[in-house]
Swiss-Prot record:
It is an enzyme of class 1 (oxidoreductase). Keywords: Detoxification, Flavoprotein, FMN, NADP, Oxidoreductase. It comes from the Bacteria. The gene is namA. It comes from Listeria monocytogenes serotype 4b (strain CLIP80459). Its EC number is 1.6.99.1. This is NADPH dehydrogenase.
Length: 338
């Protein structure tokens, strides 16, 4: 059997294969209330029907002010749970495990009213200047990640991913470009890591399942985080109880990274080896053979697929065919599956 279609355990959760749907914002909430819609159900459940092992929902705001836009999913109140529970049941029906990415946009929020960040530095000249978070407000952010994790548990999710990448709030704390604080949340790397550590520990108080963290392994900017900075971060995450790091790049500043097939895989490889922690690789992974090479050469443990799954909900089926495998599909599709 190919490695791509072997089982993988995240703590006590067994994935049927190593294909993960990357969290990708859909901006499709209809009433600006954070509640999942029929679109979200069809969108995510179709990828489970297509054979994906773990489907991770898009960035889901833990605070209303933490949305990227007014059309983001949310878990800041109990009314948002039932629609997500229905969605999770749909994923489970097709044999996929269900993950959710908990997030706070920080200074990248595009919302009416006040936005917040570690320091009062705007994303760019066109963006609103954020208000610097007080220590009390930081503690409330941490508490709201915990509350959202509890609601994720109530909805039946198997995996929680904490979004610490792409220039959103936690990434803003991690990077010296955006964190100019002079208290115990700023300055040395250990201080800049503090909010993420606090969030992980708070989530674990209500959540005993696996925790993934998405990071941006380079800021693509002078004075920003580079790969070598993420090795100690990854070691600290492992010590805090994180199971796997989802390794992306960029998003902190307004610069386009160089993009080519597998362009982020070396970052996942280096963090995996340098910190001794499992990683997920992503970045223009489009074929089964490409995914299999990454796994067999032990460059990552999971394959996280984004845009290719937008183009093709049946990526897993096609990847299996490319690798000479046959995977089970929905029984309703059996006459056309093989």
């Amino acid at each position: 059997m190919s490695k791509l279609f072997s089982e993988y355990k995240l703590k006590d959760v067994t994935l049927k294969n190593r294909i993960v749907m990357s969290p990708m914002c859909m901006y499709s909430v209809e009433n600006k209330d954070g509640i999942a819609t029929d679109f979200h159900f069809a969108h995510y459940v179709s990828r489970a029907a297509g054979g994906t092992g773990l489907v991770i929902l898009e960035a889901t705001a833990v605070q209303e002010v933490g949305r990227i836009s007014e059309f983001d999913l949310g878990l800041w109140n109990d009314e948002q749970v039932p629609a997500l529970k229905k969605l999770v049941d749909g994923l489970h029906y097709h044999g996929a495990k269900a993950g959710i990415q908990l997030a706070h946009a920080g200074r990248k929020a595009v919302l009416p009213g006040e936005i917040v960040a570690p320091s009062a530095i705007a994303f760019d000249e066109k963006s609103d200047k954020p208000v610097e978070l007080t220590k009390e407000a930081i503690k409330e952010v941490v508490a709201d990640f915990k509350r959202a994790a509890y609601r994720a548990k109530e909805a039946g999710f198997d995996v929680i991913e904490i979004h610490a990448a792409h220039g959103y709030l936690i990434h803003q704390f991690l990077s010296p470009i955006t964190n100019r604080r002079e208290d115990n949340y700023g300055g040395p790397a250990g201080n800049r890591y503090k909010i993420l550590s606090d969030i992980i520990k708070a989530v674990k108080e209500v959540w005993d399942g696996p925790i993934i963290v998405r990071v941006s392994a380079t800021d693509y900017a002078h004075g920003g985080l580079q790969l070598e900075d993420h090795i100690p971060f990854a070691k600290w995450m492992k010590a805090d109880g994180v199971e796997l790091i989802d390794v992306s790049t960029g998003g902190l500043v307004n610069v386009a990274p160089p993009v080519f097939p597998g362009y982020q895989v070396p970052f996942a490889d280096e963090i995996r080896r340098g910190a001794g922690i499992a990683t997920g690789a992503l970045g223009l992974i489009t074929r089964g053979e490409q995914a299999e090479e990454i796994l067999c050469n032990e460059r990552a443990d999971l394959i996280i697929v984004g845009r290719e799954l937008l183009r093709n909900p049946y990526f897993a089926k096609d990847a299996a065919k490319q690798l000479g495998e046959t995977i089970e599909g929905p029984k309703q599709y059996s006459r056309a599956w093989k």
